[in-house]
């Protein structure tokens, strides 16, 4: 049967389908379990590379193994692609021909005229072995392929065709047309770059026998929580459109397009048009960015020598220099073979070494740049024994290349008072001898200092980050015990040591006059002092409630233990994550379970702790004389600090909802609320807004926002696909997150949920021999990701404590610039 041109119409494909399959012997008897191998004499086609002439042509193949009338969906698809070919700039237009005659795949001259082939087929065997061999030869010659919806059911016994389409539908996929939300995660591919981030549309959604994620590059996923996916559901990661470079050519598949109405949609036609631009060689695209085999994770540091921390201390943060060196710190825990001193009568109680190591990419060697004597080495044990103080954070001056200034956030051992069990926390500036990679400890300039209690562990925070204006952000923990509140709000005012509460975070995180439980923002000056930038939460000069009850350094209040923060210097947006309390389940009496939290912070704000968590879910108040008795629920819109340990304002700023929160039960837990806005906190009534993550043991570990540098010549930089995506992780590596998420700029500052998330666990590998215990991650100037693995112990370093690097090795976009088609003029 001859090919038809773009304006022709013919009916009755059933005659060809029946004849073709009888000729192939495929209608006689039951289906074979495997396809016969093609006759070698039928696989010697020679198709010019790349196929297609000066003017771009697209072949639509709509053959089907089923008998009957021509499908209206196929007709709609053909008409839509014809329309697409006539649209857009002249240089992006193309000619369309359609056929149901599979003999075109054995005609090398005719097949070689087409830049891309579109399969609008139904299921079943639609090609003979020789015809499939012709299609394979076409792809090997750098041809393009687009499969639409039921094309994934074609050639069911061919492993090669399975690879071409990427996945096979599950037999029990729902057949009903349902409206669902598609998460459009690739904002650069021509098939998706102009689509809504959250694309709501009806279709017949397919489930997959095997999830193709990691083997293909997924450009869009369907959100299963928005429709009924049935028993064969794929879960939170449900790819619906993807692409990859395959067998010498380019393959794009979409599971959408299963309805006639799909082809009437402007956005769906734009989706197909972008797929065709890439497969016809009219545009380049990166279809390698999320294929896990394109990444390499390598350990950069060796295990320490016995009894030494020559390679790494107890990992607690890292930063990269413009020349590629990686500076990373050890908090203060010693090698496990060394004794620790926990007796407060001993002047050396808790004494440890906060180490700064430097890994040099030129030599691939490690230098111990310096050691600070810190309070931070008491080993493990209960909360009145262990300690999380020490060397907590590191940053390099924005002009580090010229001045060699290094900023350290730490607790000096010289500043402890064993009698009162108080200590001094400080942020200091040191100068590095750049020739020797050694810190000049005598160069210290103390910028900022404040008191912390050290009678009880925990929650020191520690991360620091710069914005583009030279403002330094400093994350501090609530300096509070995890106990005495049954794992709910840390608001028990009773426990204290010599008058200082250590179980009431209203003294710290909820206190407008205390620097603990905050993210501070200051502007360091060259003389070692600092000024306060405009736009902090307070000026420090407020006269409310008598005055003298605020600190101007506070940018964010109400955070519990923000170990890691980052700032996207392109937007100066702050990203933070903090660890939550310990309650394993929600309580209708006391409030939410432990929520670990991530937030996009676009302005000074109160993030809630210890009054509210998540999306403004309140805790129950408690107070003297009997903190075991619940009082009223906190008002997240107008919180009050009525703790006897508060020396700040009573009336606090309203709480801003957070973007990501998770508990042992799941991600984004929420509950029905009563007329006062109080959730029921009944576990059986919980719903989960973020099904892609879950807690258990959990410790949020905020990461960077990746920014692609097109001018960089680095061969290891991550692709542009990741540009603008925010990396969120957890110390633990089971159900806990290790994901890249896409936020909507319109809603992210007000607690908007991520619109898209994808797992990084096969790229930043989990497991005992991988990066099991994530302790920090940042991109370097080379575009590679540098990661700290804490190791397998606690309060010490061990053989698994290490610095890692994750690089991209997949190559650039395809097709090569020299293979781009000219297009119709």
Feature-to-residue mapping (PLM):
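Beta-propeller domain segments
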Residues: 286-292, 334-354, 380-384, 389-391, ...
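Extracellular ligand-binding/catalytic regions of CAZymes and related secreted enzymes
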Residues: 37-53, 226-228, 232-240, 244-290
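Residue-level detector of Asp-centered blade-edge/turn motifs that repeat once per structural unit
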Residues: 320-323, 396-402, 466-469, 568-571, ...
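Catalytic beta-strand/loop cores that center a nucleophilic Ser/Cys/Thr
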Residues: 39, 43, 167, 173-248
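Secretory targeting and sorting signals
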Residues: 2-36
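A glycine-rich, often tryptophan-bearing local segment used as a flexible ligand/cofactor-contacting loop or short
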Residues: 119, 124-195
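Helical hinge/lid and interdomain linker segments adjacent to catalytic or ligand-binding clefts
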Residues: 57-154
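Asp-box/WD-like beta-propeller blade repeats and closely related beta-sheet repeat scaffolds
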Residues: 421-465
């Amino acid at each position: 049967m001859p090919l038809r041109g773009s304006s022709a119409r013919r009916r009755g494909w059933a005659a060809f389908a029946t004849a073709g399959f009888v000729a192939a012997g495929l209608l006689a008897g039951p289906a074979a379990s495997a396809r016969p191998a093609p006759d070698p004499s039928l696989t010697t086609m020679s198709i010019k590379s790349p196929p297609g002439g000066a003017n771009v042509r697209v072949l639509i193949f709509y053959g089907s193994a089923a008998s009957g009338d021509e499908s209206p969906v196929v007709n709609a698809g053909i008409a839509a692609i014809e329309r697409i070919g006539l649209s857009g700039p002249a240089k992006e237009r193309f000619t369309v021909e359609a056929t149901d005659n599979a003999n075109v795949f054995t005609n090398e001259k005719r097949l070689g005229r087409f830049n891309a082939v579109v399969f609008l087929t139904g299921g079943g065997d639609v090609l003979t072995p020789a015809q499939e061999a012709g299609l394979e030869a076409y792809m090997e010659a750098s041809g393009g392929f687009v499969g639409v919806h039921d094309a994934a059911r074609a050639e069911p016994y061919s492993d090669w065709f399975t690879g071409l389409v990427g996945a096979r539908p599950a037999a029990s996929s729902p057949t009903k047309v349902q409206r669902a939300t598609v998460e459009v995660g690739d904002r650069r591919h021509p098939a998706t770059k102009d689509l809504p981030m959250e694309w709501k549309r009806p279709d017949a959604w397919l489930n997959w026998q095997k999830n193709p994620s990691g083997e293909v590059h997924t450009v869009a996923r369907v959100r299963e929580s928005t429709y009924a996916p049935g028993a064969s559901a794929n879960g939170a990661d449900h790819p619906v459109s993807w692409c990859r470079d395959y067998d010498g050519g380019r393959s794009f598949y979409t599971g959408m397009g299963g309805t006639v109405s799909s082809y009437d949609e402007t956005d769906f036609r734009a989706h197909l048009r972008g797929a065709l631009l890439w497969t016809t060689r009219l545009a380049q695209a990166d279809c390698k960015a999320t294929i896990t085999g394109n990444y390499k994770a390598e350990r950069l540091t060796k295990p320490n020598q016995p009894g030494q921390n020559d390679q790494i201390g107890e990992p607690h943060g890292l930063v990269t220099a413009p020349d590629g060196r990686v500076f990373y710190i050890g908090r203060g825990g010693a090698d496990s073979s060394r004794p620790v001193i926990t007796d407060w009568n001993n002047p050396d109680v808790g004494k440890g070494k906060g180490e700064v190591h430097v890994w040099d990419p030129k030599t691939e060697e490690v230098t111990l740049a310096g050691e600070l004597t810190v309070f931070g080495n008491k080993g493990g044990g209960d909360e009145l024994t262990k300690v999380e103080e020490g060397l907590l954070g590191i940053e390099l001056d924005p002009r580090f290349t010229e001045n060699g200034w290094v900023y350290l956030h730490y607790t000096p051992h010289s500043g402890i008072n064993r009698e009162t069990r108080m200590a001094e926390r400080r942020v200091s500036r040191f100068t590095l001898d750049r020739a020797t990679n050694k810190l000049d400890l005598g160069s210290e300039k103390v910028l900022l200092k404040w008191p912390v209690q050290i009678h009880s562990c925990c929650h020191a925070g520690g991360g620091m980050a710069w914005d583009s204006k030279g403002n330094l952000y400093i994350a501090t923990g609530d300096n509070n015990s995890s106990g005495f509140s049954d794992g709910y709000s840390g608001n028990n005012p009773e426990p204290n040591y010599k008058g200082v509460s250590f179980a009431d975070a209203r003294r710290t995180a909820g206190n407008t006059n205390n620097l603990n439980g905050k993210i501070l923002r200051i502007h360091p000056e060259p003389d070692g002092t600092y000024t306060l930038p405009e736009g902090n939460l307070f000026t420090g000069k407020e006269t409310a409630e008598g005055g003298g009850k605020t600190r101007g350094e506070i940018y964010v209040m109400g955070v519990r233990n923000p170990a890691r923060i980052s700032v996207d210097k392109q937007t100066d947006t702050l990203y933070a994550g903090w660890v939550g309390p310990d309650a394993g389940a929600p309580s209708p009496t006391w409030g939410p379970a432990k929520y670990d939290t991530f937030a996009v912070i676009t302005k000074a704000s109160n993030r809630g702790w210890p009054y509210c968590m998540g999306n403004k879910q309140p805790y129950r108040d408690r107070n003297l004389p009997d903190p075991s008795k619940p009082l009223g629920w906190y008002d997240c819109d107008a919180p009050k600090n009525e703790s006897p340990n508060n020396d700040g304002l009573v009336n606090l700023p309203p709480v801003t909802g957070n973007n990501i929160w998770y508990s042992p039960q799941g991600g984004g837990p929420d509950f029905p609320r009563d007329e006062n806005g109080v959730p029921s906190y009944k576990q059986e009534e919980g719903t989960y807004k973020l099904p892609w993550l879950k807690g258990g043991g959990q410790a949020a570990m905020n990461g960077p926002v990746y920014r692609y540098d097109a001018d960089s010549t680095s061969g290891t930089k991550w692709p542009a696909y990741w540009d603008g995506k925010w990396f969120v992780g957890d110390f633990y590596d089971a159900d806990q997150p290790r994901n890249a998420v896409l936020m909507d700029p319109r809603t992210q500052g007000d607690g908007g949920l991520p619109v898209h998330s994808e797992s990084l666990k096969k790229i930043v590998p989990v497991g005992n021999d991988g990066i099991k215990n994530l302790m920090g991650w940042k991109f370097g100037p080379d575009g590679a990701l540098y990661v700290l693995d804490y190791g397998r112990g606690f309060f010490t370093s061990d053989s698994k404590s290490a610095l890692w690097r994750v690089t991209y090795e997949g190559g650039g976009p395809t097709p090569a610039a020299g293979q781009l088609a000219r297009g119709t003029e």
